[in-house]
A protein has these predicted regions:
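A glycine-rich helix N-cap at a beta->alpha junction
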Residues: 74-113
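Glycine-rich phosphate/pyrophosphate-binding loop at beta-loop-alpha junctions
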Residues: 65, 73, 106-121, 141-228
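A short, small-residue-rich loop immediately preceding and capping a beta-strand
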Residues: 29, 37, 48-69, 73-82, ...
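Positively charged, low-complexity intrinsically disordered leader regions
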Residues: 1-50
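Buried hydrophobic positions in well-ordered alpha/beta secondary-structure cores of metabolic enzymes
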Residues: 4, 22, 34, 41, ...
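Acidic-glycine-rich active-site phosphate/pyrophosphate-binding loop
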Residues: 6-21, 125-133, 149-163, 220
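Generic hydrophobic/aromatic pocket-lining and core-packing "Φ" positions
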Residues: 38, 42, 66-67, 93, ...
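Glycine/charged-rich beta-loop-alpha catalytic/anionic-binding loops adjacent to active sites
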Residues: 17-28, 48-53, 136-144, 166-174
């Protein structure tokens, strides 16, 4: 079932000018877009005849979604998570445990997502004969980036249809605004529009930049950080 595409009428009236809409990806099963990627990986795991799946998580949503689909598909599930994130994401950690997943605390480095991804990959490389790995963001080896991107592109596949239903066509001067962290929701939101005329559709990413003129940031693309 497609997630809703709704007009934010009060915000539109308050700000004036632009017609403001929201794609309610939080309607997706489990409350986030991460479910699309998790389902894809669970199906791949079953196709490969493996009984275990591993993944990473930061805010906890990716781990929660993987634990949900692992339970549904009858798979064992390990979720690698930085200890700092475990401390501040208790509700999602509780959900993972209720679904039968094992949370593997990661104490190395910053004790957050980047280190959880690294530890997850290390574990998978040592156990790839019996374990399937799914990465929750657009990071890591190319094939995992492609799988995540294709899965979360369900957002823009739905949105394209909904825009045409609402306006009769893709409207001119359309601005698609999305947060940018690991990139899964941003790519998923933009995927179907990447090749559109840039005078017709503008893709706008909002990312954490940290304190002004500081090295305390996540290497934002706006500061010309390298990709790959």
């Amino acid at each position: 079932k497609p997630t809703r595409f709704i007009k934010l009428q009060n915000l539109t009236d308050h700000l004036g000018g632009a017609q403001i809409y929201a794609k309610m990806v939080s309607d997706a099963n489990g409350g986030a877009h991460k479910i699309y990627n998790a389902i894809t990986h669970a199906m791949l795991c079953k196709r490969a005849k493996k009984k275990y799946i591993c993944t990473d998580t930061g805010a906890g949503y990716n781990g929660k979604m993987f634990s949900m689909v692992a339970k549904k598909f009858g798979l064992g599930c390990k979720v690698f998570m930085g200890t700092r994130d475990i401390e501040r994401q208790k509700p999602n950690c509780d959900a993972m445990k209720k679904n039968g997943a094992e949370i593997v605390p990661v104490n190395s480095g910053s004790k957050t997502l980047v280190d959880a991804v690294s530890e997850c990959i290390r574990y998978w490389v040592s156990n790839c004969d019996k374990v399937h790995m799914g990465i929750g963001s657009l990071v890591g080896p190319n094939i995992f980036v492609k799988i995540c991107g294709w899965s979360t592109a369900q957002i823009s596949r739905e949105l394209k249809v909904q825009l045409e239903e609402e306006f009769g066509e893709i409207p001119n001067k359309l601005k698609l605004i999305n947060c940018v962290g690991g990139g899964s929701s941003a790519y998923g939101f933009w995927s179907e529009f990447i090749d559109c005329n840039k005078n017709k559709v503008e893709l706008i990413g909002v990312e954490a930049g940290g304190p002004s003129n500081s090295k305390l940031h996540a290497a934002p693309l706006s500061k010309n950080s390298k990709i790959g």
